[in-house]
């Protein structure tokens, strides 16, 4: 589970790489649209917080060659990210920073912070702390965007986030029904 810290799975027999690559495949269809929806100016500094396989980071790097793109994620995830970036020939365009989302410096200041599909992995207090840390990493006038799974108010629909929410809530106290998923703001 991608929760800001190394998974407790340990020597997982390839599970983490399979998970990260699966997330990359899932994000690939949206990445270019997201990069166009949040255009960058030359020289802008971007933080992809919990960037996983760097799918969105690569889309920004390709679409906006003058931008400085950073992916912050856990060391185990970034082992996979490095492989993916080499495969795409993008390792020189994306800077990688390893750490614990809640403890280690995020760097910055950044002009844009992208937070995609990580908030559901946190219990409410940690989720709020992470959002505050992201806000603190922004330059004056900086902006942030969050992409996340959401449940309707009854917390049972739509089906995909509903099925997803149960396991996440059991693991980290998060889940798609967490107040961090749609009910808080930077």
Predicted feature residues:
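Alpha-helical subdomain
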Residues: 45, 49-186
């Amino acid at each position: 589970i991608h929760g800001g810290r190394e998974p407790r799975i340990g020597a997982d027999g390839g599970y983490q790489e399979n998970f990260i690559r699966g997330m990359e495949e899932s994000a690939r269809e949206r990445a270019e649209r997201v990069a166009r929806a949040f255009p960058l100016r030359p020289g802008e500094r971007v933080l992809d917080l919990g960037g996983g396989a760097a799918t969105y980071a690569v889309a920004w790097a390709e679409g906006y060659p003058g931008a400085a793109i950073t992916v912050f994620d856990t060391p185990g995830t970034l082992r996979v990210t490095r492989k993916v970036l080499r495969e795409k020939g993008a390792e020189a365009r994306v800077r990688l920073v390893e750490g614990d989302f809640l403890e280690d410096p995020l760097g910055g200041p950044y002009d844009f912070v992208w937070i995609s599909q990580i908030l559901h992995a946190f219990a409410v207090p940690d989720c709020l702390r992470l959002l505050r840390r992201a806000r603190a990493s922004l330059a004056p006038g900086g902006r942030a965007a969050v992409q996340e799974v959401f449940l309707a108010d009854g917390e049972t629909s739509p089906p995909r986030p509903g099925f997803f929410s149960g396991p996440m809530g059991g693991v980290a106290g998060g889940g798609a029904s967490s107040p961090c998923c749609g009910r808080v703001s930077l």
